[in-house]
Design a protein with these regions (language model features):
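Conserved ABC ATPase "signature" region
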Residues: 116, 127-145
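The feature captures the beta-strand-to-loop junction immediately N-terminal to the Walker
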Residues: 47-52
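ABC ATPase nucleotide-binding domain "signature motif"
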Residues: 154-160
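Conserved ABC ATPase signature
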Residues: 149-153
Length: 160
């Protein structure tokens, strides 16, 4: 099994940890992926991870967002243990998420409805949500494709 090598690209004066892993372990079946992982990411810090395929880099992001849960250990966000928060509650309360390497969208929904799906998790006011969606569509010059299903968009359009 390979090793994940975390590194700090830029560290600022603020040392308040916003994400912390304490003795986190995870297995897929009989295969141990993470074994008592400990690290923290401080507020305003730029942080990265390097490692060969299959050592758990994407798994760590899935654990942070709550898409999967650890076998052992604690995951903390802003000092609060979040192991038992469901993904949608974690996303809403802590305003976290990430775009996976192969896209974070619903293929059969339009661009507009993909944004709406995210907005329904993070914004309580439907009028404000629609205003925000329209603002983003306009800002990224996507008006002419807002009703096209995500599976028909180019790679660059999906990234926007």
């Amino acid at each position: 099994m390979g090793i994940i090598k975390p590194f700090r690209i830029k560290s600022f004066k603020n040392k308040n940890p916003i994400i912390q892993f304490e003795n986190v372990s995870l297995s897929y079946g009989n295969r141990l992926i993470l074994d008592n992982i400990n690290f923290k990411i401080n507020q305003t810090e730029i942080f990265g991870m390097l490692g060969p395929n299959g050592v758990g880099k994407s798994t760590i992001f899935n654990l942070i967002t709550g898409l999967i849960l650890p076998k052992n250990g604690k995951i903390k966000i802003n000092g609060e243990t979040v192991n038992n928060y469901p993904v949608f509650q974690r996303t809403k309360k802590f305003k976290i998420g990430f775009v996976p390497q192969y896209g974070g969208y619903f293929a059969d929904l339009s661009l507009h409805n993909n944004l709406k799906a995210i907005g329904e998790i993070t914004i309580n006011n439907k009028i404000l949500m629609e205003e925000r969606i329209n603002y983003l569509i306009s800002k990224f010059e996507l008006e002419n494709i807002k009703d096209i299903k995500a599976k028909f968009l180019s790679g660059g359009q999906k990234k926007k």
